[in-house]
Amino acid sequence: MTNPIIAFQNVSKVFEDSGTQVLKDINFELEEGKFYTLLGASGSGKSTILNIIAGLLDATSGDVLLDGKRINDIPINKRDVHTVFQSYALFPHMNVFDNVAFALKLKKVPKKEIEERVKEALKMVQLDGYQKRSIQKLSGGQRQRVAIARAIINQPRVVLLDEPLSALDLKLRTEMQYELRELQKRLGITFVFVTHDQEEALAMSDWIFVMNDGEIVQSGTPVDIYDEPINHFVATFIGESNILPGVMIEDYLVEFNGKRFESVDGGMRPNEPVEVVIRPEDLQITLPEEGKLQVRVETQLFRGVHYEIIAYDNLGNEWMIHSTRKAIEGEIIGLDFMPEDIHIMRLNETEEEFDARIEEYVEMEEPEDGLIHAIEEERHEENS
């Protein structure tokens, strides 16, 4: 990574009135011009990180850096960041122009320059011509665009977005996801986006930080996190998963459901207990005798693009299958999957331990025939 625009170094936060620790030794670096997402459930600490970057909250310990300089004691108005809040925080008595121009007027920017910059900012969010429109007469999506225009008009280095799409209906929220992502690419500004919506994070981000209980439990590209969840929490929080107990017999061979299957994972102890993850969309329905597993269909729901089928094997394990084929409740079906569809999770492994294990294992492999090496090389190229 080039010099990070934002960095957290061992940042913790404790609310003194309650004694609650909401951030625990947080470390990360943000590169300029990328779209980052802090993803987690309510109370995970994601908004606290955003507020510390903005200067709305102080870190209890640790350092917050902007362009390599410590900004813990720098006031809000001296930080080159701008926040878009969930409520948008627009002035209802002002029209669109005055809302967007507010900060420029405070800085006593010349009137002609204000008009030009407001017009350009509104054009960026497809609201040029709305300058005289009352805020009260705008739709939710239009108010969102005004808030974003106000955020970018000062050309900040970083834009912070605190669940800005959560109040919108599904269709409008999806449209705004596209618009926000395209806007960020055009501007080249670092966006830090907070959400509890996994699909939103996967769709928009260059890099995701998954948070739980004040800690970053995994970070990576959307593809990395979806395809290689680090633990049970991430696997269940990001998308739907079938998770079963298993045993890693040896490299590339795992046992679950009383059977042994080829996999693409290695670097673990022989006969080590693990958890096995197979995504619902990676399961193919076959004739019972042709499947690697046999299950009985319990129920199904039509989700528009696929049927969501719930089935049980003879050990009582529940299986979720996403299929374009409609099943018959009560029928026995076969399930087929490929070795690369099987994702192995060590029990209670941290992200640091995972990275160290993979690095050590790759060094042991021959480059020309090392499967793990090839996978890691591919992931490295995708992240470059």
Curated annotation (Swiss-Prot):
ATP binds at G40, A41, S42, G43, S44, G45, K46, S47. Keywords: ATP-binding, Cell membrane, Membrane, Nucleotide-binding, Translocase, Transport. It is a peripheral membrane protein. SMART domains: AAA. Its EC number is 7.6.2.11. Residues 6-238 form the ABC transporter domain. GO terms for molecular function: ABC-type polyamine transporter activity; ATP binding; ATP hydrolysis activity. One of its GO terms (cellular component) is ATP-binding cassette (ABC) transporter complex. It comes from the Bacteria. Pfam families: ABC_tran, TOBE_2. It is found in: Cell membrane. Gene3D superfamilies: 2.40.50.100, P-loop containing nucleotide triphosphate hydrolases (3.40.50.300). It catalyses: ATP + H2O + polyamine-[polyamine-binding protein]Side 1 = ADP + phosphate + polyamineSide 2 + [polyamine-binding protein]Side 1. Part of the ABC transporter complex PotABCD involved in spermidine/putrescine import. Responsible for energy coupling to the transport system. Belongs to the ABC transporter superfamily. Spermidine/putrescine importer (TC 3.A.1.11.1) family. The complex is composed of two ATP-binding proteins (PotA), two transmembrane proteins (PotB and PotC) and a solute-binding protein (PotD). This is Spermidine/putrescine import ATP-binding protein PotA. It comes from Streptococcus thermophilus (strain ATCC BAA-250 / LMG 18311).
